[in-house]
């Protein structure tokens, strides 16, 4: 199968396979099998076939040359595309086998399987929301996900200016749990560890 067969087949009803449908199929990875040696990567294919959708084969060839520098989607873009379009977080793109083996070796559970005696878990931050307390101190609400696909919130207290949390990267953390407030953590610098 080729891009030409998909785009210019007389048997396909193109009002059904419109630009939006093609966009979702390409960015979710469903059409990876159509990317051949003419394309420098998935982003190049997406730009040439979807963004500037050709009506004729000649225009497709022009697009292939025009968008050649696009290359491939970054890892961050691929994670965002798969998570947003399929609703499933691509843990395989974030957590490599070495890190996964180490977590299992040290018996560190995902946050959904929190153990109050151990108080150490791993997760992947998806979003950081910055807030202020009544007294004006900054704290963060971090939305996280783990291998069980459970999304959870962690409140980070005592945030300092130099503290950083990378989105879509695995972390191990010492956290507390309260029935009323849920998960919380103090001192990102001391209690959070970036894995891999």
Residues covered by each model-derived region:
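Acidic surface patches and DE-rich sequence motifs
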Residues: 131-135, 146, 178
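Flexible glycine-rich surface loops and low-complexity tracts that mediate binding to linear polymers
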Residues: 123, 166-190
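Short acidic/glycine-enriched loop/turn segments that link adjacent beta-strands
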Residues: 136-138, 182
């Amino acid at each position: 199968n080729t891009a030409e067969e998909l785009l210019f087949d007389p048997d396909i009803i193109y009002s059904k396979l419109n630009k939006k449908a093609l966009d979702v199929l390409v960015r979710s990875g469903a059409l990876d099998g159509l990317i051949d040696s003419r394309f420098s990567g998935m982003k190049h294919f997406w730009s040439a076939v979807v963004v500037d959708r050709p009506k004729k084969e000649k225009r497709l060839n022009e697009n292939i040359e025009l968008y050649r520098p696009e290359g491939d989607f970054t890892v961050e873009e691929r994670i965002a595309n798969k998570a947003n379009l399929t609703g499933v977080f691509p843990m395989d793109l974030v957590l490599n086998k070495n890190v996964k083996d180490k977590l299992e070796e040290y018996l560190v559970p995902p946050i959904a399987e929190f153990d109050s005696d151990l108080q150490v878990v791993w997760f992947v931050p998806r979003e950081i929301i910055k807030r202020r307390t009544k007294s004006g101190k900054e704290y963060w609400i971090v939305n996280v996900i783990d291998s069980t696909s459970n999304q959870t919130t962690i409140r980070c207290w005592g945030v300092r200016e130099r503290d950083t949390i990378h989105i879509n990267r695995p972390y191990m953390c010492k956290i507390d749990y309260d029935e009323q407030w849920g998960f919380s953590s103090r001192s990102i610098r001391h209690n959070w560890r970036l894995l891999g």
